[in-house]
Amino acid sequence: MAATAVEAWDERWATPAGRADWLVPHPAVAGLVPVLKARGAQHVPDLGCGVGRHALFFAEHGFAVEAIDGAAAGLDFACREAAARGLRLSLRQADADALPFADESFDYVLSWNVIFHGTMGDVGRRLAEIWRVLKPGGLFQGTMLSKRDVQFGRGRAIAPDTFIRGSDPKAHPHFYCD
């Protein structure tokens, strides 16, 4: 993700108002915990963890968690929250384009509302990294934006199916796919 986008997330995560919509785990993620436990998953990465809503949730359910984000303010908040709750998280400021893990490290990888921030090439590199660190037969849970989304085509086109909304220099691209 571009440095300016990371700066924008740092600004957002630094305030309670900016974090407010990102504190509760998404039900689709929370609902997968029984499946992960049944499959024997123990060590999970949350790529683009933001303020840690999913990373903290997984830690509360006994998983060893790798919380990864480009924005330091989100990681700082997740670190404070983990300490306040008596939870352990491994927090890393890193880019999903080059994950700091060995091949086939995880039974499950989460990337919620993150990997579509960029062009098709960016998304492809992130998906390649996810597949690299995912064990054979492992599960990937993530989100993408659809061309059927009402936001598709809004903003300034910077690449095929990729748009930046708004004129803020810190705005980041959104890639839409079929």
Walk through the language-model features, giving the residues of each.
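Conserved beta-strand/loop positions that form the S-adenosyl-L-methionine
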Residues: 47
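A short glycine-rich, Lys/Arg-flanked "PGG" loop and its adjoining helix->strand segment in the class I
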Residues: 124-136
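Class I (Rossmann-like) S-adenosyl-L-methionine-dependent methyltransferase catalytic domain
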Residues: 1-41, 51-98, 122, 139-178
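A short SAM/SAH-binding and catalytic strip from SAM-dependent methyltransferases
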Residues: 108-122
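A short acidic, Gly/Pro-enriched loop at the edge of an enzyme's catalytic core
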Residues: 97-109
